[in-house]
Structures are given as structure tokens and as C-alpha cells.
Amino acid sequence: MNIPEIIHGIWLGGRIPLKLKNYRRSWKRYHRDWEFKLWTEDNLPELENQTLYDKAITYAEKSDVVRLEVLKEFGGVYADMDYSCIRNITPLIEDADFFIVQDGKIWKKNHPRYGIPYLNNAFIGCTPNHRLIKLLVDSLPGFALENKDYHVCFRTGPGFVSQMLKDEDILRLENWKIRRKYAKHHYENSWKDIEPQPRPWPED
């Protein structure tokens, strides 16, 4: 497999809820030989986009910064803490050097710029220093500034990766196909009380 057998998770602020710990354990159950890295405020690597991280209002935005940079440095698979695993994902990604989950066929209604595939950085992986992960790390500060008045989902999260990767030939794991066989996103949205989720939300 091209992508390193590493599964990254990020938790910033407070204790990890038991439900999320159980989701995390599900990955270990089906990937016993893989390395697991849980990034917290106590062990973050040196960040290229440290200024953006420091200025971020929400933990979601901070996490968006960190996930791209740890993937650039180490490679591997990043899964949000509210993703649970149903079986080993190797068959899904064994021939890929970059993948991302696709939540919907297109963005709808929310944003005039996003009539494009709805990609989600909640589940993403690559080889170290992959061209596209470098593109995302390099482009994030400018994009976030340009879209500073939009919701975090648009300025640093799914909206950002959707816009940057819309024309790239990459492996897109269709969420509606994998969620009953490999991995399920539970959409806990632990950050939504700080910055409420926008409505309407993109539809399939």
C-alpha cells in the first residue's frame, strides 16, 4: 500500500467524550497492525500555518489546519473523531496515493460558488508530501482570509477542499456507499455550539 498505515485523530479542548473514544477504538479493532496518532494541544507538531491556527476562533478551524499538516509530514489516514470503523479500509485505498471522502454529488443552495462535488476533509489520506496535500497547506491561509466572512465549513473545511480539489483526478470515496461497509460518519458536530451549522446544508 502506498499510503502509510497510520491513522491520525485530533482532539483539542477538554476531555474526549466516551462516545468518541468508542468510535476511535473501532479503528484499532480493525487495524491492529497500524500506528495510531492522537494529536492534542500537548503534542502538536510545528505548524507552517501557525498564525492561522492561533487566530482560529473554533476548534474545528484549528483542527482543519492541523490535519493537513500532519498528513503532509507523516502521510497516512485522517479520520474525524466521530467516524467509526466497520472493517479494515485497506481494500478501499490500497492503490491510492491520495483520497478524500465525497459527501454529496454537488453542493446545493448554501453557497453560489459551490455547484461542485461536495468533498469532506473529515476522512482524507495521502502519502507524505503529496503534491495535493502541499497545495492544500499552501493555499489555506489565503483562502481562509478571502472567505473570512463565511462559516468555518466553507473557509477552512469541506468548502475549501471542495474548491481546491474539484478538478483533480483523485480517489473519491462516496460516503453513501462506504458508510455501511467500511466507515460511518456520525456527524456529532461537537463544535456547532460555538459556530452553528449553516442551513440549508448540502444535499445528496
Regions inferred by a protein language model and the residue ranges of each:
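Glycosyltransferase-associated regions of secretory-pathway enzymes
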Residues: 1-64, 79-204
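Small-residue hinge/turn detector
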Residues: 64-76
